[in-house]
Amino acid sequence: MKFVDRFRGAVAGMLRRLVVEAMGVALLSALIGVVGSAPAEAFSRPGLPVEYLQVPSPSMGRDIKVQFQNGGANSPALYLLDGLRAQDDFSGWDINTTAFEWYYQSGISVVMPVGGQSSFYSDWYSPACGKAGCQTYKWETFLTSELPQYLQSNKQIKPTGSAAVGLSMAGLSALTLAIYHPDQFIYVGSMSGLLDPSNAMGPSLIGLAMGDAGGYKAADMWGPSTDPAWKRNDPTVNVGTLIANNTRIWMYCGNGKPTELGGNNLPAKLLEGLVRTSNIKFQDGYNAGGGHNAVFNFPDSGTHSWEYWGEQLNDMKPDLQQYLGATPGA
């Protein structure tokens, strides 16, 4: 009888977990469009010295569009990385914020790679095949080798001592770039990212989101969930490296409660609550490992929305300038 009771309990527990996981998958599928496509119209005002570069990428076999604002000769760079539904015309940072205005004459060069939908700014194992066809995704190689070399040679921008800031999908991407390229990225900003992708349902949720966004497959990126690439690209697993590198971290995640800034819609509220747990988990690991070079902003408000990410980018500007040694007005 005890065996039967235990068996029934185990089955009931398994069913509960399956229901919860199914609800999570369904929820993410319904919500992931919250950072969806915006009009093909850049926000930056006329008169700002914004350039539209076509940077050769031998690794991806094509030129990559990059929006760029020069901060002066030998200035550090701020790489702004986009969300899951990154467009091919303009960066979401330019469409949805006044980032170029905020950082004009800051002494920091602003670099916005365009495109890379669902890429996680990673080097994929296989071609990225989606609804629009197939292409090669070698974004880590581009961001850490091809692009900085181009900017150094053509725009006199420092290839080291720079920052990577990403939102949503790119929150973990920015952290991963800093983990493996610490000389280039001494400062990293993560906003509302899912920071434990290898954990439990992480691979399934990411695969579902990528499929919904553009028909992409997570296995083409990092292989099956058992592949080491999932842990290799997990900031929470590798938090010790960030601590050892003494990387400066600025991390933000709201709790799903809107403020007067906006984002008062159900998808934005629920999705922010969904990713907050992984951010707190990262913070716990960072503190437990003795980390002491981070700013954690986890307010009792904020939704998965550009209004909050833009505010954070503006707020971190003095910290960025000081840490990168920028010379304002250059």
UniProtKB/Swiss-Prot annotation:
Chloroplast as UniProt keyword: no
Class of the enzyme per the UniProt entry, highest EC level: transferase
Subcellular compartments: Secreted, Cell wall; Cytoplasm
Cellular component annotations (GO), alphabetically ordered: cytoplasm; extracellular region
InterPro entries: AB_hydrolase_fold, Esterase-like, Mycobacterial_A85_antigen
Keyword Signal among record annotations: yes
Disulphide bridges: C129-C134
Positions with a binding annotation for substrate: L84, R85, S168, D196, L274, V275, R276, T277, K281, H304, S305, W306
Signal peptide start-end: 1-42
Major localization class: secreted
Swiss-Prot/TrEMBL keywords: Acyltransferase, Cell wall, Cytoplasm, Disulfide bond, Secreted, Signal, Transferase
Residue numbers spanned by region Fibronectin-binding: 100-110
Reaction equations catalysed: an acyl-CoA + a 1,2-diacyl-sn-glycerol = a triacyl-sn-glycerol + CoA; 2 alpha,alpha'-trehalose 6-mycolate = alpha,alpha'-trehalose 6,6'-bismycolate + alpha,alpha-trehalose
Family from the record: Belongs to the mycobacterial A85 antigen family.
Free-text function comment from the UniProt entry: The antigen 85 proteins (FbpA, FbpB, FbpC) are responsible for the high affinity of mycobacteria for fibronectin, a large adhesive glycoprotein, which facilitates the attachment of M.tuberculosis to murine alveolar macrophages (AMs). They also help to maintain the integrity of the cell wall by catalyzing the transfer of mycolic acids to cell wall arabinogalactan, and through the synthesis of alpha,alpha-trehalose dimycolate (TDM, cord factor).
Assembly notes: Homodimer.
Name of the protein this chain belongs to: Diacylglycerol acyltransferase/mycolyltransferase Ag85A
Organism (species): Mycobacterium leprae (strain TN)
